[in-house]
Amino acid sequence: MIYQGKAITVKPLEGGIVELNFDLKGESVNKFNRLTLSELRAAVDAIKADASVKGVIVTSGKDVFIVGADITEFVDNFQLPDEELMAGNLEANKIFSDFEDLDVPTVAAINGIALGGGLEMCLAADFRVMSATAKVGLPEVKLGIYPGFGGTVRLPRLIGCDNAVEWIASGKENKAEDALKVGAVDAVVAPEQLQAAALDLAKRAVAGELDHKARRQPKLEKLKLNAIEQMMAFETAKGFVAGQAGPNYPAPVEAIKSIQKAANFGRDKALEVEAAGFVKLAKTSVAQSLIGLFLNDQELKKKAKKYDEVAKDVKLAAVLGAGIMGGGIAYQSALKGTPILMKDIREEGIQMGLNEAAKLLGKRVEKGRLTPAKMAEALNGIRPTMSYGDFGNVDIVVEAVVENPKVKQAVLAEVEGAVKEDAIIASNTSTISISLLAQALKRPENFCGMHFFNPVHMMPLVEVIRGEKTGETAIATTVAYAKKMGKSPIVVNDCPGFLVNRVLFPYFGGFAKLLSFGVDFVRIDKVMEKFGWPMGPAYLSDVVGIDTGHHGRDVMAEGFPDRMAVEGKTAVDVMYEANRLGQKNGKGFYAYETDKRGKPKKVTDPQAYEVLKPIVVEQREVTDEDIVNFMMIPLCLETVRCLEDGIVETAAEADMGLIYGIGFPPFRGGALRYIDSIGVAEFVALADKYAELGALYHPTAKLREMAKNGQKFFG
């Protein structure tokens, strides 16, 4: 053995070729943490010092190669002063460069996935051979940063600027055949042949059949582009990528700038350029928010995994109520491999549900994401019915009938009589109390909420709601089923609106206040979209449905009269009374026309302003900053209350719920991280400036205490 550590070993194979093997003890995957980096330093030094070594193959002892840097460790480094962070980055890069500069040929054998630092390790090798099932990529831009272990330097010199920009700026994972096509790898082989193929490549290089020094040379030099070619390549790329990423996500454009700036330098100077840009991005609030999101998501997955021990296996599911929502739930279940009964009392409802599922599956086939055979398999997994005949075999039932407590209670009691005693029943209600609905059931311990968001196939969040009498098996099974459907479940406790709608309606409350002061809803939408929301509150109201918003507002006002009840009529009341229900009937705040693709397109409608005139109580001058504060303060404070009331267990879950459920701007990290970014004391002071607007703007006593003590929600 040439070197043995806890993450890396180097052992002789044959003919002077050694295997540098990554196999991090106690972990299911390999990652670059401090231990792995320090051992790589030692392993490279050991290889360099051993005159008998004639070649190196780099392998993994796990099912994947290396998933990248351990962000939980490296995020602490981002708090260091710029000079220290840059020095640390360059020190790590020296390890990869020293590996690249070994006198002997090096071959990386890529299995599973090689992402971020994992791919950068492979780029430092002379040759790369890849398993046909493996994927490679540089996903750092998704964390608000860019590759920091030489990725922006080596990749463009290997596969050309255009390809490298696409890989780095998109952050996507690339299949083996695509990597081979652009020249990122030298060979693709069947998984079982990977080790032998890597060894063969190394032998050929040792024998002089392959010139490893010639392969290495382009990575050490400047880019092979003249000044005009550089200008055309980089300026076009920056314009296109900036348009795609938008102004709130600087990392993709910064990556291109770094590649451009380093284009005329050799490797070592180019790595300094990369490090300087990396440090600049690491210090941005966007990077802190997106890394925070990543860590929150990891926490969510860990929590959801804990329920697996108690969860029952769901072999057959059912949905009550077809239509668009029921069809969406059936589609998602069948697509992910759980067959589902879809029951409705009307033939038209069943047809609508089947049409919805077929349409969604058809779109996947069109995009090449599903084979026609798999589409047929998924469609066969949806079994329409108008009776409870087969419900005796069902493991979980999702009730998705009309949002009316009496109707839901009647349907739930009916289905309870048709299923086996240990079947789980879940209601897809968005606002009705789970404990109230449970009163109609004989086995309330088997009942919980399972709130999907519309459209089901696009929205990742599922709220799993625990009622007063809900048992752990019901929660665990519902969480496991949601995960199996490809969703991100969050367990919340019962209250009006649960987590997401409880937080959303105060946001709409802020919108109502602005409208009552005569502020143009088109302006409000523009300001909030600029803030980072996918759509402004007027457009969102139209998409959700004014009638849905009207009903939800009444439920929330009843549940929280101290701050959500309103005096007199608001915008949603007059819109509802004028039968302007939003997209569903072609007129709401906006009017809707059908575009060439048959999709609704919003246009301003003077009639909407006439409808709103009676609710304007005064004309008030407000700045764009005021608009943001009117909207965001109530949303943030209600999120704080949900955490304090135990509706949601952790700050991470609260923030992820808003990002996955209502499209809270990811680069701002969630409502609680947004408060942290302003500063808790500063946020409390800001809210106090708007105190005259009512209780929605009044911080809680506990938040004031946090402000006084200098506390934060994260870190």
UniProtKB/Swiss-Prot annotation:
Q: Where is this region: 3-hydroxyacyl-CoA dehydrogenase?
A: 312-715
Q: Which InterPro entries match?
A: 3-OHacyl-CoA_DH_CS, 3-OHacyl-CoA_DH_NAD-bd, 3HC_DH_C, 6-PGluconate_DH-like_C_sf, ClpP/crotonase-like_dom_sf, Enoyl-CoA_hyd/isom_CS, Enoyl-CoA_hydra/iso, FA_oxidation_alpha_subunit
Catalysed reactions, as listed in the record: a (3S)-3-hydroxyacyl-CoA + NAD(+) = a 3-oxoacyl-CoA + NADH + H(+); a (3S)-3-hydroxyacyl-CoA = a (2E)-enoyl-CoA + H2O; a 4-saturated-(3S)-3-hydroxyacyl-CoA = a (3E)-enoyl-CoA + H2O; (3S)-3-hydroxybutanoyl-CoA = (3R)-3-hydroxybutanoyl-CoA
One GO BP annotation of this record: fatty acid beta-oxidation
- EC number per UniProt: 4.2.1.17, 5.1.2.3, 5.3.3.8, 1.1.1.35
What's one GO MF term for it?
NAD+ binding
* Residues at the active site: 451
Q: Where does substrate bind?
A: 297, 501, 660
**Sequence segments annotated as region (Enoyl-CoA hydratase/isomerase):** 1-190
User: At which positions is NAD(+) bound?
Assistant: 325, 344, 401-403, 408, 430, 454
How is the quaternary structure described?
Heterotetramer of two alpha chains (FadB) and two beta chains (FadA).
Q: Which family does it belong to?
A: In the N-terminal section; belongs to the enoyl-CoA hydratase/isomerase family.
**What protein name applies here?**
Fatty acid oxidation complex subunit alpha
Protein source organism: Pseudomonas aeruginosa (strain ATCC 15692 / DSM 22644 / CIP 104116 / JCM 14847 / LMG 12228 / 1C / PRS 101 / PAO1)
This chain is encoded by the gene named: fadB
